[in-house]
Amino acid sequence: MSVSAFNRRWAAVILEALTRHGVRHVCIAPGSRSTPLTLAAAENPAFIHHTHFDERGLGHLALGLAKVSQQPVAVIVTSGTAVANLYPALIEAGLTGEKLILLTADRPPELIDCGANQAIRQAGMFASHPSQTLSLPRPTQDIPARWLVSTIDNALAMLHAGALHINCPFAEPLYGDMNDTGLVWQQRLGDWWQDEKPWLREARRLESDKQRDWFFWRQKRGVVVAGRMSAEEGKKVAQWAQTLGWPLIGDVLSQTGQPLPCADLWLGNAKAVTELQQAQIVVQLGSSLTGKRLLQWQATCEPEEYWVIDNIEGRLDPAHHRGRRLVAKIADWLELHPAEKRKPWCVEIPRLAELAWQRVVAQRDTFGEAQLAHRIRDYLPEQGQLFVGNSLVVRLIDALSQLPAGYPVYSNRGASGIDGLLSTAAGVQRASAKSTLAIVGDLSALYDLNALALLRQVSAPFVLIVVNNNGGQIFSLLPTPQSKRERFYLMPQNVHFDHAAAMFNLRYHRPENWEELESALAGAWRTPATTVIELVVNDTDGAQTLQQLLAQVSHL
């Protein structure tokens, strides 16, 4: 009997089972203990393979692939701390709903807690963060193949959103030629190998029912809050709100076109808040809201009903309003709850939104971080997509720009960390093969610098704008102690990114005005390659501009 051969047959059943649930992308890190899984994935023609030497980046690459493909993505890593490096991406997926299947190779039980090399307690190590956890036994022919495949099918059928962690122990030897060991065991699955359906098919319905009193509520004064959603959903939500005559407060990730732009500015005006107090119902579609003023208003508003509609299960309202939590796909929910044509009831808010927009436009000629955020819609590639980093950059775009309705926008706004942003953007590009504009801050770029290796080979133009404000300038917006701010919060690194781009053989530009930036972008969109554009700006100008605009708009 060959242990290595049966390990591979066991792994082949696991990987083949994944194909029956829509898995097409498999992300693989190097490792020895994961050899059975890696070879099974490599030999399965149904998969598109992605490799990366850094497991933390690999997890975020998978996250980006899942965001765009809307299908589960598998990740294969070896045992030990390699597994722990998947934690940040797993946490993000749990909060934003992307389906990740983490196949973590492990030592067999007799090598755990006895001083064996690269052996840690992996079973259950991610605590409550995975949506599903499956700890498989050591491969053995005493367990029928139908148990293995039905166990995988059951776990995937139960995976509504988030990550599935499958821990896979393998005993040595891990290498060797294939022979007939386990062939009969494998063949007992019969024509399943030629089929395309799961061995065990389970139906699970999570969709919310139609709200029978919707005909009553749609005649009331309402407000629509749009959070993270798809491009198609964003267009439908915008039309739905317009028909109802309800003001739409659109997040940067809503893709609604933000018909009332600069919401994070005008929500700081007391007149706007007073008018919103007249709302009898607030309908929030999508989660992960960005704007500080929006979150402050959400925390204090008291409509008769507050509804939250999102495909993700669980509570998504940090203000704990009285109302309804409806689990449904946004497009399906809109179809069940059609709008009734009514005149807009808000008068002051459209006026304030227009005045706020004019104040922002008046400053667009200055070369700076806030102005880039406002101008970003002018730099979007045609029929492309935008990836937005975290910290200050996403807040500036949310507050100062107006992105086109239905234009794909992606970000990691679940846990909102700055780790893995470049890797996630790489996954977004690979899944769509569209021209991609990504914009991050300098610390975010440094945090995931080795992800530039993932951007060496791209299928469409990829532009990475690094806004270098020399540190974490978002802390300039917070009441951090002035004497401690630079050393303990901002942490300026005084670096530039030309050498990093050169190390990975990427194009690089450092424009000093808008004309040079536009020239660099024009050239970048003509070639299927990655271009790094470093925008060096004055340290605190972006934060100060936002604060000045907030003060101006609050007094309109």
Swiss-Prot record:
Molecular functions (GO terms): 2-succinyl-5-enolpyruvyl-6-hydroxy-3-cyclohexene-1-carboxylic-acid synthase activity; magnesium ion binding; manganese ion binding; thiamine pyrophosphate binding
Pfam families documented for this protein: TPP_enzyme_C, TPP_enzyme_M_2, TPP_enzyme_N
**Domain of life, per lineage:** Bacteria
Look up the record and give one Gene Ontology term from the biological process aspect: menaquinone biosynthetic process
TM spans (from-to): none
Per UniProt, the keywords (alphabetical) are: Magnesium, Manganese, Menaquinone biosynthesis, Metal-binding, Thiamine pyrophosphate, Transferase
Names of the cofactor(s): Mg(2+); Mn(2+); thiamine diphosphate
Q: What broad class of enzyme is this?
A: transferase
| SUPFAM superfamilies documented for this protein | Thiamin diphosphate-binding fold (THDP-binding)
State which pathway it belongs to.
Answer: Quinol/quinone metabolism; 1,4-dihydroxy-2-naphthoate biosynthesis; 1,4-dihydroxy-2-naphthoate from chorismate: step 2/7; Quinol/quinone metabolism; menaquinone biosynthesis
Q: Which reaction does it catalyse?
A: isochorismate + 2-oxoglutarate + H(+) = 5-enolpyruvoyl-6-hydroxy-2-succinyl-cyclohex-3-ene-1-carboxylate + CO2
Q: What is its EC number?
A: 2.2.1.9
- Does the keyword Magnesium belong to this entry? yes
For this chain's record, the cofactor binding note is: Binds 1 thiamine pyrophosphate per subunit.
* UniProt key word Manganese: yes
Tell me its family.
Belongs to the TPP enzyme family. MenD subfamily.
Q: What does this protein do?
A: Catalyzes the thiamine diphosphate-dependent decarboxylation of 2-oxoglutarate and the subsequent addition of the resulting succinic semialdehyde-thiamine pyrophosphate anion to isochorismate to yield 2-succinyl-5-enolpyruvyl-6-hydroxy-3-cyclohexene-1-carboxylate (SEPHCHC).
HAMAP family in UniProt? MenD
Q: What NCBIfam families does the entry give?
A: menD
Q: How does it assemble?
A: Homodimer.
Q: What is this protein called?
A: 2-succinyl-5-enolpyruvyl-6-hydroxy-3-cyclohexene-1-carboxylate synthase
Query: Which gene does this sequence derive from?
Result: menD
